[in-house]
Amino acid sequence: MLLAALLALAPAAPAVAGPIAVRFPEGIVHGFLVLRSARGESLAHGEFTQTVRGDHLESALVFRFIDGSLYDETATFTQRKVFRLMAYKLVQRGPSFPKTSEVAFDRGSGRYRARAGNDTADGKLEMPEDLHNGLTGILLKNLPAGAAGSGHIVAFTPKPLLVNTTLRKEGEDRFLLGDAPRTATRYLVHLDVPGLKGVAASLMGKDPPDLRYWVATGPVPAFLKFEGEMYLKGPRWVVELAAPRWPAAPSR
């Protein structure tokens, strides 16, 4: 009872309502990633690229799996004072996924098209200003210290479902860079299906699982790690930064 009372009196993290403000502007990026199973098995290698096209930025994440599967995600956004998602595309195919799926939506037209296996859907799509499909890691780097954020993502089955999201700091973890200890902030991204569909999901024990991101602290925040599902009802995967491997030098 005392613990409950203390928790009730503890101040909650200040919430950032609406789109996340730009604190660290994005630019040209090219990084390398590895995707592993929860048991640590290497499943895929990936690349993250970001390009600037006028006042729009295009963020692309591609994983090529050992079994031939493909995960190809592209988010186009602007960063005039706040981050604003303008367009999104996602392709998932191959044996690592239950079925081939393709999704695309665009704020300019206000429309979407989606395919999951043999099922297709298209039409008008509600796109809140704080929609962040493909931008979650960027938003977490820009959250003010100690603040929580909220937003939305769209899930497709293939019909669209708007999901509420809460982004908050969960804790801190130590990691090593060489022998030097560093600190990473661990963020929790909570997904919540609103309305009667959310109630039904809770009753059936099918609430969307939480996602976790690790971001290096300091004056220049940097993505370190992701852990969670990358498709509906999928396994828990881990994404981390990867270092290139060099072929053995020939003997001289």
Where does each model-flagged region fall?
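Serine/threonine-rich low-complexity intrinsically disordered regions
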Residues: 2, 128, 144, 193-198
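Bacterial N-terminal signal peptides
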Residues: 1-11
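Acidic, serine/threonine-rich low-complexity disordered tracts
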Residues: 17-107, 150-252
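Surface-exposed beta-loop interaction hotspot
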Residues: 112-151
